[in-house]
C-alpha cells in the first residue's frame, strides 16, 4: 500500500526543533517546570506561553486520565481552558468541583465552534487544541513549544498521535492532501516506530496540535460549517496560502482513545460534505 509520500515530507528544515536531541533543556523552551500550570501562572503574575484548550461534549469518563497526564508535564508553561459544549453527563459539575477553568456553552456548537471560543478567550502566544480522550506524554507540551518557536513562519505543529490501546500503531502523524484530491491521516494504523522524522505536512491534526494564535486574526478561525471533521485541513490550507508552514514533530507524543470528543452523535455532517467545503475554497496555482 502506498504511503502517499510527497514534497511536504521531503523538505522539512525544522528538524532541529523536533528531533531526538540529547540532553534537551526544557527551560529554554518552556520557562517553568514546577507546579501546576494555571496556579503557578497566577502566583507569579507571569503570562504563560500556551493555553491548552480542551473541547468537551459528554466526555466525563475521559477527563480524569487526561488531566492526570497534563498534571505530570515536565514543562509547566501553560494554562488550561475547557470549553464545554452543553454536556449532560456530569461534566459540568465535575469541572466546577475540580475548579478547572472552563467556559460552559448552552448547546453543542461542534468542535469548530468550541475551539473558536477557546482561541478567542486565550491570551497566550500559542494555543494547544487537545481532545479530551488523549493522554499526553510527559514531554508533550515542552516539545510542542520548542518546535513552534523554531520559526515565526510555523503556524501549527502536529504531534505523534499513537493509539492508546495499541501503542505499536499510529493514530495520526499530520494530515495530508493527495494529488487526486483526497485528504487523509498520515500514518494511521501503521507502525509507530516508522514515524520518527520531522517533516512538513499539509495541515496539523487539531486533536492535539499547537497553533500560533495571532495567525488566526490574519487567516480566520475554524470554519464552523465543518461541525466535527476536516476543519483542521481547511485552516491549515488557509495558513499555507498565507505563507506559513505546518510541521510534524515526532518527539511530542500523545496517546489517543479515538472518537471521544467527537463520536457519531457529535458528527452529523459527513466527512465527504466537509471535503466539498474545503475544495470550494481551493486555489490552484
What are these regions (language model features)?
Residues 68-77:
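Short, acidic, metal-binding catalytic loop of nucleotide-sugar glycosyltransferases
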Residues 178-201:
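Short, flexible, basic/aromatic active-site loop/helix in glycosyltransferases
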Residues 69, 84-92, 107:
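A conserved acidic beta->alpha catalytic loop
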Residues 127:
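Short aromatic/hydrophobic "clamp" motif used to bind/position activated sugar donors
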Residues 246-285:
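Active-site-adjacent helix/loop segment of glycosyltransferases
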Residues 202-253:
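A short, conserved alpha-helix in the catalytic core of glycosyltransferases
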Residues 134-178:
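Conserved donor NDP-sugar-binding/catalytic core segment of glycosyltransferases
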Residues 105-122, 132, 143:
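Glycine-rich, basic loop-to-helix element that forms the pyrophosphate-binding segment
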